[in-house]
């Protein structure tokens, strides 16, 4: 490949990254649901004409590492012409779990015509012009159908989890496909909110496409595409350099999920990380078979988790492009917890199993890089959904949230308290926004003081969040680290286990399993005490 100018490369890194970031801002500011506009449960990225990622926003790792497989599936199954938008969420066709819906659009020189709710006639010539880029966004919809509000319950197959959307056109030539939209909305709760969020995603794609066309117009198509290629190659070289600095060898580790909510049995995840020169192989052979409950991860999730771990080892100035994964091979045997076969239920694979994969790979690498790898963070997203009829309006509501916990202690610093870590990068819904949007009241929200694992550097403390329901509702929870604590490293203590309770209106208290659904009455409270991070090094 031709040589490049380092200064110009950095300019393009910033340009393409700013496109993805601005897409995220547009999505956040125009979305309707608190889960997107307040919690920022979305991600945006820019791809080249082959579907290779060029740049990502600083969004959700679990989305970003798996989104390339969604784009690949869309390109394999459909033709995305000018003004088209393809949607998908099918975990077995490039998706991850059903609430995360990905929208993808092409960018063709000289036109863009996706405007939500407005018809645009595309010039026929544009339909034959070559695609320059693709833009994609993924957002977690607070309900996508299924047996329980929030679509995060304990289904035993994917059919019970909600609406599966294979790669399909949601917009053609700038016009929303009303039949497709109606079909989706007929099968979800709070359909007006879902529709508004889909339209916000479409608008985000328009923003990204317009910005990319401005770059091409300002700097020229040839140079813009050449430097997209340079960004990918540069990322690959930097990742190979990072891997080459790890001592050659084979490093093994095991961790486990508590259970799948059905069998009560621990679910082991085993990994062998083999480093040879400037390449890495991450092999999950020996991990648990897929399970009946909703903790199964599809291959895209496992690749995403591995991508995140190795991304943490590379400097932040290295472009987050497809090149990062070129020197890394991931072996995830089909039919296991890390690469489940259809029709496995997968709601928790995205949010819980991804965290345990990260914990396990970091644990293996800690044997090779003892001075760089942190202790385990809380290792769960504490997924909480509450839904029913809002007594204030008589309309359906569906509340979804992940609750922060403790970060693992670092080799030179304490872990941070009450924060989202690893595969999530979201926020907790502000109490004011939560109470305005839902028939819920935040009774307590604080740091779980003293819960972090002790050590030379202390693990971050977990959080306490207590929410009262103001009317009858169904609550579901998918969480973990209730039986096996987040590990400490180098002599540091483990973090505290998480726990959750229902406090009934009469004052009685029921401790909850980590996974399940429960009926709530007006005045009942849900209390979650999240796990803390492990400590690093011996105290004193």
Where are these regions (language model features)?
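Glycine/proline-enriched, intrinsically flexible loops and inter-domain linkers
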Residues: 1-97, 101-110, 130-281, 285-540
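Short, basic, low-complexity termini and linkers enriched in Ser/Thr/Gly/Pro
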Residues: 109-131
């Amino acid at each position: 490949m031709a040589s490049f100018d380092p200064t110009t490369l950095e300019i393009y890194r910033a340009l393409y990254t700013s496109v993805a970031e601005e897409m995220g801002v547009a999505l956040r500011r125009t979305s309707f649901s608190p889960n997107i506009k307040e919690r920022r449960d979305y991600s945006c990225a820019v791809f080249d004409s082959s579907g290779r990622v060029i740049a990502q926003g600083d969004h959700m790792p679990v989305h970003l590492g798996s989104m390339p497989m969604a784009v690949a599936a869309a390109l394999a199954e459909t033709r995305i012409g000018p003004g088209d938008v393809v949607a998908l969420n099918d975990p077995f066709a490039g998706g991850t779990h059903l609430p995360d819906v990905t929208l993808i659009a092409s960018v063709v020189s000289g036109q863009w015509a996706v405007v939500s709710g407005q018809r645009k006639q595309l010039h026929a010539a544009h339909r034959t012009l070559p695609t320059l880029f693709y833009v994609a966004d993924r957002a977690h919809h607070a309900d996508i159908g299924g047996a329980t509000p929030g679509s995060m319950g304990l289904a035993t197959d994917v059919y019970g989890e909600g609406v599966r959307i294979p790669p399909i056109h949601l917009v053609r030539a700038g016009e929303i496909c009303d039949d497709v939209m109606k079909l989706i909305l007929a099968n979800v709760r709070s359909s007006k909110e879902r529709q508004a969020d889909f339209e916000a995603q479409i608008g985000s794609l328009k923003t990204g496409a317009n910005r990319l066309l401005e770059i091409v117009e300002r700097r020229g198509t040839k140079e813009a595409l050449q430097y997209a290629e340079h960004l990918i190659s540069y990322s690959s070289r930097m990742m190979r350099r990072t891997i080459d600095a790890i001592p050659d060898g084979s490093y093994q580790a095991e961790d486990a999920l508590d259970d799948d909510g059905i069998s009560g049995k621990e679910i082991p995840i085993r990994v062998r990380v083999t480093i040879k020169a400037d390449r890495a192989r991450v092999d999950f052979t020996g991990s648990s078979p897929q399970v009946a409950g909703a903790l199964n991860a599809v291959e895209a999730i496992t690749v995403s988790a591995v991508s995140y771990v190795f991304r943490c080892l590379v400097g932040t100035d290295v472009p987050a492009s497809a090149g990062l994964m070129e020197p890394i091979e991931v072996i995830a045997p089909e039919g296991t917890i890390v690469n489940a076969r259809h029709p496995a239920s997968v709601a928790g694979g995205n949010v819980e199993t991804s965290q345990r994969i990260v914990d396990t790979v970091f644990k293996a690498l800690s044997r090779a890089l003892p001075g760089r790898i942190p202790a385990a963070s809380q290792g769960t997203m504490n997924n909480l959904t509450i839904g029913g009829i809002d007594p204030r309006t008589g309309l359906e509501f569906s509340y979804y949230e992940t609750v922060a916990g403790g970060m693992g202690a670092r080799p030179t610093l304490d872990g941070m308290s009450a924060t989202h870590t690893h595969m999530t990068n979201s926020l907790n819904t502000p109490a004011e926004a939560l109470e305005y949007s839902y028939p819920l009241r935040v009774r307590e929200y604080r740091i779980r003081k003293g819960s972090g694992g002790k050590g030379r550097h202390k693990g971050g403390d977990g959080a306490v969040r207590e929410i009262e329901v103001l009317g009858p509702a169904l609550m579901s929870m998918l969480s973990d680290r209730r039986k096996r604590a987040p590990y400490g490293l180098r002599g540091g203590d483990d973090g505290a286990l998480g726990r959750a309770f229902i406090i009934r209106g009469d004052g009685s208290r029921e401790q909850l399993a980590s996974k399940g659904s429960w009926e709530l009455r007006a005045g009942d409270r849900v209390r979650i005490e999240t796990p803390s991070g492990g400590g690093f090094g011996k105290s004193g």
